[in-house]
Amino acid sequence: MKVAVVGVQGDVEEHVLATKRALKRLGIDGEVVATRRRGVVSRSDAVILPGGESTTISKLIFSDGIADEILQLAEEGKPVMGTCAGLILLSKYGDEQVEKTNTKLLGLLDAKVKRNAFGRQRESFQVPLDVKYVGKFDAVFIRAPAITEVGKDVEVLATFENLIVAARQKNVLGLAFHPELTDDTRIHEFFLKLGETS
């Protein structure tokens, strides 16, 4: 199994390491590569869009053709995961900040997102969440977005303060938090198996 981590910004190396550990725990022989170029995602079995700044990441993936490769992978039923800014990019609708910056979204998750949903005063925090299919998970939030609305085909996996912070639509997984910043690989393991269950 080959997993691509789109290495434009964010916790790229942490995602690479967490995914390698998850593959090992699942007993799957695999390779995890960080990429900033077209051609790698299209030859992969799964892809991760890490956090960072959503406007910058959007410009780069759409101008370099990586966005088309992510869309194709999702269409093929392969696992796609976005964390923090990656969640924003996976979503169909953004808030006024997303619209004001003309950030192009992939539209793979029928959801509306709000940037910096928990306010600037809570830029970084960690809370235990009850994540469906995973169980209790210590989630790290950093200037996190949240999902405010979902379509009928989206399954809510976790909420915090009445906002959705994890959701799934078939093989696409969106998280407001950073699972790669913990030693717990269960969310990466769940992600890697999404192609089997979608």
UniProtKB/Swiss-Prot annotation:
It comes from the Archaea. InterPro entries: Class_I_gatase-like (IPR029062), PdxT/SNO (IPR002161), PdxT/SNO_CS (IPR021196). GO terms for molecular function: glutaminase activity; pyridoxal 5'-phosphate synthase (glutamine hydrolysing) activity. It catalyses: aldehydo-D-ribose 5-phosphate + D-glyceraldehyde 3-phosphate + L-glutamine = pyridoxal 5'-phosphate + L-glutamate + phosphate + 3 H2O + H(+); L-glutamine + H2O = L-glutamate + NH4(+). In the presence of PdxS, forms a dodecamer of heterodimers. Only shows activity in the heterodimer. The keyword Lyase applies. This is Pyridoxal 5'-phosphate synthase subunit PdxT. Pathway: Cofactor biosynthesis; pyridoxal 5'-phosphate biosynthesis. It comes from Archaeoglobus fulgidus (strain ATCC 49558 / DSM 4304 / JCM 9628 / NBRC 100126 / VC-16). Catalyzes the hydrolysis of glutamine to glutamate and ammonia as part of the biosynthesis of pyridoxal 5'-phosphate. The resulting ammonia molecule is channeled to the active site of PdxS. The gene is pdxT. Belongs to the glutaminase PdxT/SNO family.
